[in-house]
Amino acid sequence: MRVSWDIMRDGLPIIIVNLKTYEQGYGADGFDLCKIMEEISIEHNVNLAAAVSAIDLVDYSDNLKIPIFAQHIDGINYGSHTGSILPEAVRYSGAIGTLVNHAECQMNWEDIEATISRCRELGLLTVLCTADVEATKRGATLNPDMLAVEPPELIGGEISVSTAKPEVIRDSVSAVNQINPGIPVLCGAGVKDKADVSKALSLGSQGILLASGVVKSSEPRKVLIDLIQGL
């Protein structure tokens, strides 16, 4: 069941779980995790979404009732681009959008612009990932649908950005509001529990992008239930 998700209609905050290329994050195991997210989303009326492998986009989009994002799209048109991820193919898959410029899949400025432009043409949402306040401020000028600030040194760590560098969230939100207050700012890196989520939202964030804290957990349902208490 392919779903649509509109920022203004369906509201915020949102938690986006990036399945990355973890052993637990693809195929049947990844699907089972997303099914847990779907159940929690419905039971507790919260916005949960997943960023998944390109290989799993069609299966997950067809069979889940949560928004599915790609982890990466290339800002290309039809043609000779072997190995690239075509925006039209992602749209066809049923995914609603994509991460752009994740710290583990960084892009140059020209490619970021091209990707956001192509996604806009096709109605795909973009979550532009940035590393710091200056990058977030610059990224806001491209008018992505969402910005997600993640200091790379904290990604996958035990200390949340909202604890280690709260000023990054606060100042990023302030910078974006001066350029386009309609762009929600998410945050990520080290987010593990409801206290991290609550602190992030108190600093002006409108959502969370996280990965290992959920995907690598032996009890993802328990972790997700805890996380949504912070929304």
Regions picked out by a protein language model, each given a short descriptive name:
Residues 96-107, 146-159, 201-223:
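Glycine-rich phosphate-binding active-site loops on the catalytic face of alpha/beta enzymes
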Residues 83, 91-92, 120, 140, ...:
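Non-catalytic positions within long, well-ordered alpha-helices that form the structural scaffold/packing
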Residues 26-33, 52-62, 78-88, 103-118, ...:
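Active-site-adjacent beta->alpha loops and helix N-cap segments on the catalytic face
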